[in-house]
């Protein structure tokens, strides 16, 4: 399931980059890229055929054990960046203002998840190298992880939960603005599909928050939580890969549709949200 979701996200991302009629902002690209990286990190043993049988390559197992404890934080961080950018876009459309700190703050939101992830990865990797006896393949043989009284999982889950909690706060604010200013947003040129996708995205974010809290209190959450976590890339690919402009880009045999002219305010203030 995770491989399918990762493959679909890769197709979506490549299409968005190469298709001239598909425009996406940097936070959207960052979100899809992070999801793909996460899928690769969890499936390293699958790619080299070492999920079953003898113990996997020690070096690969050490690297993967550090990755699987770091990438959930990256996912939570890019999730926050995307919803924060959505908030600035909706706010711009409602209050007719430019997006908050258009350059510096936006770059900080996009770069911060990867900086934090690299720091965590290096920390976990150093620990795994110094304590190789704590690294083992999980019970289902899917990936290698660090087993040390549940501490690495709780560190990852705790940081992810904080980031997701902030995301949920932003999502509630965005949902409230959408409800209160529905007509204004429709007249501003913001597509209705954008509203639907924000609500779906918010539901997924809330689900991730609950799952990270499960990881904190139960040291892993069990196979049920693992299954839902593995399904998130597939959910993301369905949410972000079924937008009209992407589908039209894949239907290359159809003539291009004439571009609709957006209102001036919509072009200046609300371009580049989730669409």
PLM region descriptions:
Residues 116-177:
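Extracellular-loop-to-transmembrane junctions of the mid-late helices
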Residues 37-52, 117-138, 203-226:
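Helix-to-loop junction signature of class
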Residues 26-29, 51-58, 91-97, 129-146, ...:
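Interhelical loop segments of eukaryotic multi-pass membrane proteins
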Residues 78-88, 169-183:
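Membrane-water interface of transmembrane alpha-helices
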Residues 173-216, 232, 236-239:
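Intracellular effector-coupling site of seven-transmembrane GPCRs
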């Amino acid at each position: 399931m995770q491989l399918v979701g990762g493959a679909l996200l890769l197709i979506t991302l490549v299409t968005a980059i190469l298709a001239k009629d598909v425009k996406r902002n940097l936070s959207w690209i960052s979100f899809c890229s992070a999801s793909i990286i996460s899928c690769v990190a969890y499936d390293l043993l699958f790619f080299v055929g070492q999920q079953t049988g003898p113990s996997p390559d020690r070096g690969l197992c050490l690297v993967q054990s550090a990755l699987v404890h770091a990438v959930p934080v990256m996912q939570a961080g890019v999730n926050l960046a995307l919803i924060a950018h959505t908030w600035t876009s909706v706010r711009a459309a409602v209050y007719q203002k430019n997006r908050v700190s258009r350059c510096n703050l936006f770059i900080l939101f996009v770069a911060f998840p990867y900086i934090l992830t690299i720091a965590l990865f290096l920390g976990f990797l150093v620990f795994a190298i110094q304590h190789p006896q704590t690294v083992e393949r999980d019970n289902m043989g899917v990936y290698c992880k660090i087993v040390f009284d549940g501490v690495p999982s709780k560190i990852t889950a705790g940081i992810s939960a904080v980031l997701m909690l902030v995301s949920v706060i932003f999502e509630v604010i965005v949902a409230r603005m959408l409800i209160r200013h529905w007509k204004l947003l429709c007249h501003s040129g913001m597509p209705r599909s954008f509203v639907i996708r924000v609500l779906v995205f918010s539901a997924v974010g809330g689900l991730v928050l609950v799952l990270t809290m499960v990881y904190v209190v139960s040291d892993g959450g069990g196979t049920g939580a693992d299954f839902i976590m593995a399904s998130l890339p597939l959910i993301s690919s369905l949410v972000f890969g079924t937008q009209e402009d992407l589908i039209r880009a894949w239907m290359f045999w159809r003539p291009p549709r004439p571009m609709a002219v957006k209102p001036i305010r919509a072009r200046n203030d609300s371009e580049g949200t989730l669409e």
